[in-house]
């Protein structure tokens, strides 16, 4: 089924935006497995004799009482509306009290119109940014802090990572804290399944920020920065840039030809300015909708 899912998803993505990054096997498995709790997935078609036309992945997050919904449809297929109806029915059956967040490419006007007709409103905008590697990378000043790789097989490092991560994102839109046990299970899973690496920056021996990246986009010969954050008390001191430049350096040394990440367009921490400063450029825009 992963092959079918990727075929549907990439035909959808690239028809809407040929510059977008095609989905790879790791992402396909994530959509089937689930981001947090087990996913609810369906392939849909109008007639028995048809090929599969749409893929629905409904990802529950029980700790946040929230669903994340993605629907991919082959260009020209007429399965989008019935697939959305099916997803809404599955969500209600699972838990009618959950909020529903849906991701849509910014130029998928048919899907956006369908959502708005169902009473959904746009909640947030996100950009995917990418840069070419290798680049002439400015080295960060040692006075900014010391960067070391976290050993995700050690509980002490996991607890340090958890503390820094939760504090760094505590003021971000939609953030809700996760307890260590639940959070660490997700991190260990991502280490094993996506080859995630995490790096910590400390100032005078005090943990201050982190960056993590993985092989999710390896099929595109690209590294993927899945997380970058600086604790509230250390923001505005250049630590985020030092961490990002470290990620650029490591991915260049790994032989990747590109590096990409996603950013909340409404992020007030100056993240977008930082990414553009190091040479990243937007290649796609996504809109997140919410049911009211």
What do these predicted regions represent?
Residues 10-94, 104, 203, 208-223:
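Conserved donor-binding loop and adjoining core beta-sheet/short helix segment
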Residues 244, 267-271, 288-292:
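Short glycine/proline-centered loop/turn elements that form peptide/ligand docking sites
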């Amino acid at each position: 089924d992963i092959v079918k899912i990727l075929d549907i998803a990439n035909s959808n993505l690239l028809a809407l935006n040929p510059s977008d990054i095609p989905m790879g096997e790791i992402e396909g498995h994530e959509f089937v497995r689930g981001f947090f709790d087990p996913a609810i997935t369906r392939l849909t078609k109008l007639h028995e004799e048809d090929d599969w036309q749409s893929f629905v992945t409904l990802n529950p997050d029980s700790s946040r009482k929230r669903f994340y919904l993605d629907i991919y449809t082959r260009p020209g297929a007429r399965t989008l509306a019935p697939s959305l109806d099916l997803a809404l029915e599955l969500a209600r059956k699972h838990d009618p009290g959950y909020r529903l967040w849906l991701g849509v490419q910014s130029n998928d006007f048919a899907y956006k119109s369908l959502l708005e007709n169902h009473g959904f409103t746009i909640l947030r905008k996100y950009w995917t940014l990418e840069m070419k590697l290798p680049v002439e990378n400015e080295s960060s000043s040692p006075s900014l802090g010391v960067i070391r790789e976290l050993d995700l097989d050690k509980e002490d490092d996991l607890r340090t990572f958890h503390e820094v991560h939760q504090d760094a994102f505590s003021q971000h839109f939609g953030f809700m804290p996760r307890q260590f046990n639940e959070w660490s299970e997700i991190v260990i899973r991502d280490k094993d399944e996506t080859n995630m690496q995490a790096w910590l920056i400390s100032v005078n021996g005090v943990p201050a920020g982190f960056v993590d990246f993985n092989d999710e986009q390896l099929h595109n010969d690209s590294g993927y920065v899945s997380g970058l954050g600086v604790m509230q008390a250390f923001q505005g001191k250049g630590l985020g840039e030092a961490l990002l430049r470290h990620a650029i350096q490591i991915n260049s040394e790994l032989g990747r030809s590109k590096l990409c990440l996603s950013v909340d367009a409404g992020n007030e921490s100056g993240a977008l300015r930082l990414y553009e400063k190091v040479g990243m450029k937007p290649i796609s825009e996504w809109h997140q909708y919410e049911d009211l």
